[in-house]
Amino acid sequence: MRNLINRIHDTDYTEANSIIKSLCGIVNYFSSEQEKIDFISHLEVDISFVQEDKVSYGDWQTPISLAEKICDIHLSKFGSPDIVIEPTCGLGAFVVSALRKFPNIKEFYAIEINHKYVSELKLKILLNALNSPSHSHPDIYIYNADFFEFDFIPIIEKSKRKGWNMAVIGNPPWVTNSTQGRNNSKNIPFKSNIYNLKGIDAITGKSNFDISEYITLKLLQLSQINNGGISFLLKNSVIRNILTKQHTERLNLGNIEQKLIDASMEFDVSVDASCFFAQFGCSPSFICNVSDFYSNTYIQQFGWVNESFVSDTKSYSAVSKYYGKSSYIWRSGIKHDCASILELTLSNGVYTNGLGETVQIEEDLIYPLLKSSDINNYQENQFRKFILVPQRKVGQDTSELKYSHPLAFSYLSKYENAFSSRKSSIYKGKDKFSIFGIGDYSFKPYKIVVSSLYKSIRFILVSLTDGKPIMVDDTCYQLDFDSLDEAKCILDALNSKEISSLLQSLIFKDAKRVVTKSLLMRLDLTQLCRDKGATIASQRFNNGATQQLSLFD
């Protein structure tokens, strides 16, 4: 290093760049004379940065051992690349590993938004080259740039034009656009609802997405017609979303594979993550093979079977006839975002709110409440929580409570600030004490309810308690009934081995919500009842006609 410093000390930065390129391959190491002077003055680069930046950037640096293993797998799957792109290179684990593992690289492009990381990576590559001199190096371009403003098209088109094998590798940030928004991060794409969601879905957060998902989809769209492949560390949920998008995008991707990693061991974070592999230039594939990263043991296959997105293609085929359209409407429970005020506990006949205060209001507005954790451990007529329900339908004017339920109105008014401080835009412009997930169905005498959060799916039947219907919160889904016989029949269908098997072939157990409304609405219970030869009167079907279903024998 001392010899290098002596060589570049009295040169201008352009000549210094030529010297360094001949040593390690980095193109344009310095962008100015001042940068060269600073380099000489400060050989030890301070790469410390505040924890908030780490959160904003979704910054979990990849261990070298993991990056090298991924490069080995990439090499075996897609061959030795001529050109490599690392779009969010951080401290450069993938850059260093690829330079070691890929023998035929002609050009390497690394992009990183954190300028301190860029300085550290350049120095790391230079030191490696000085310690292990070589007569040939690929041209290495390291850009201090934002992915969302960087133009990849000329690089990718050059690779296509030359017929090169291209590798896209890396570990894009594991952070959502909403997290970055809350932290006022600049490392965020333009506001985009990438799934074109409308209305309530977009408002309540279904349009929230991982930055890594945006990055991956963008690069897949640009790279699909090239030779080579992609190897990315991604959250499992992101990989599923990419496969979901593939159904409509029909990108030229094949040999799609997900290899499960132990993120706790590798990154010391509790996240379900994998290495995602896909080959460019193939006929569109809609299936992903899942295996263990360390043992290479095959686990299962998920993806699209006809028009169905399933978690296990093999088990799905045996029960696919029951995947269709539900004749019953599943609804989520009450959403209020004001638990400390609306959710109550009952002890010795006295209600207490989440602030520890005694609550004395009209009893007819208070209902038993089941949350997700209660459903899987449900015992009849035993409730941890009760809920004050200020509306019987969405949009109802709660000012009428001032006359019909003065105690409740006074109580709600006391905590008006708590309601007005609710962050979700769903409440904007609505009644000040508004709730959602409420309607005539909420007050039906019989309900089948299920938690959306638990891997072990349990459907239970609940009925009136002390003459009151049981409410569920928005982590649960419900079917409502006037007839106990009909409710029991449908409960039997939901708990049948056929529906249980179907659900297991559809759910992803590492999802935030294991059970979703869209999944429940595809359970064809009427088909199952027909197969069982069961009959009971019901007018709950989409065509409005009365059909006959009954309890299973």
Positions of PLM-derived features:
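Polybasic, glycine- and aromatic-enriched phosphate-binding surface used to engage nucleic acids
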Residues: 316-553
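Signature of N6-adenine DNA methyltransferases within the class I
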Residues: 55-56, 60-69, 88-96, 105-120, ...
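Class I S-adenosyl-L-methionine
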Residues: 1-123, 128, 146, 151, ...
